[in-house]
A protein has these predicted regions:
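S-adenosylmethionine/decaboxylated-SAM
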Residues: 2-243, 253-254
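Helical coiled-coil/dimerization "stalks"
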Residues: 243-264
Length: 264
């Protein structure tokens, strides 16, 4: 079990924002350490939590890696983005990248299909598919980007455990992972990890191997689920603290007014 965890698994995300991906931060840091992708592409970003985790890893390991995220920041049936939220998210994430990850992270505000023209074939070492979550969309996003994958690449699929609201990623994941080197985390809405081509021998290849004992798979899931809960708990604590402060300030103002001497 020790080879499936390292100090990278305990890295703390520098950008913690509302995200269904929060609990996968620990695995993302470990994955980046193992794979050291020279080019990572994320399809679907919103507030950029996972994207920032990838960038943070590259910066810490000090190797020539690039991370590109692609999104229109206009939202869809599953994103919950309305009005000008997309513009605000994009601006906030761009500011974060400018401040912390110049030369590493790049935002492309366009459609996934249009971004294909900006990436060379056979160069993507890590592809993260997290766009619209209908079956056909997940399939299209994956298949249209396959030619961009490097000979030893890994593809991530988020929301593999969600089966309501029209989500169909779980169906597509069941198809592409059947009999293939892969691993699925069940916490954090589910995260599928699919091997493309042949990986170099090592812990990552062992984790994705079909011969990995089921008991070991359960232990790995439990380990990373426990680590992920810590990040989610921190986010919830900060969220409730902000709400408390927002409600407390008006009360403090009223108390101050009541404490003032009465004047006729």
């Amino acid at each position: 079990m020790q080879k499936f965890i390292s100090m990278a698994s305990f890295e703390w995300p520098n950008r913690i924002v509302p995200s269904g991906w929060l609990e996968h931060g620990p695995f993302a840091f470990w994955l980046m350490e193992q794979l050291k992708p020279r080019l990572t592409v994320e399809l679907g970003t919103q507030r950029g939590y996972s994207f920032a985790c990838f960038c943070q890893s590259v910066k810490k390991m000090k190797y020539p890696g690039r991370v590109i995220c692609v999104d229109t920041w206009k939202g869809d049936e599953h994103a919950g983005i309305v009005d000008k939220m997309g513009d605000e998210m994009h601006a906030d994430l761009q500011a974060h990248v400018d401040e912390n990850y110049k030369g590493i992270g790049e935002l492309k505000r366009t459609f996934f299909s249009e971004a294909l023209n900006h990436v060379e074939d056979g160069t993507v070492d890590l592809l993260h598919v997290d766009g619209r979550h209908f079956y056909d969309d997940a399939k299209e996003d994956h298949t249209t980007w396959i030619r961009k994958l490097a000979p030893s690449a890994v593809v991530l699929f988020h929301d593999t455990q969600v089966r309501d609201h029209g989500f169909g990623v779980y169906k597509y994941w069941a198809e592409v992972s059947a009999g293939q080197p892969s691993f699925e985390f069940e916490h954090g809405h589910g995260l599928g990890v699919l091997q493309y081509g042949k990986l170099h021998d090592g812990p990552l290849a062992d984790m994705l191997s079909p011969s990995l004992p089921e008991v070991t798979r359960k232990d790995i899931r439990a380990m990373y689920s426990r680590l992920g809960v810590g990040i989610n708990a921190h986010y919830e604590h900060q969220r409730y603290r902000r709400r408390f402060e927002e409600r407390k300030n008006p009360l403090k103002k009223i108390a101050k007014e009541l404490a003032r001497p009465f004047r006729k």
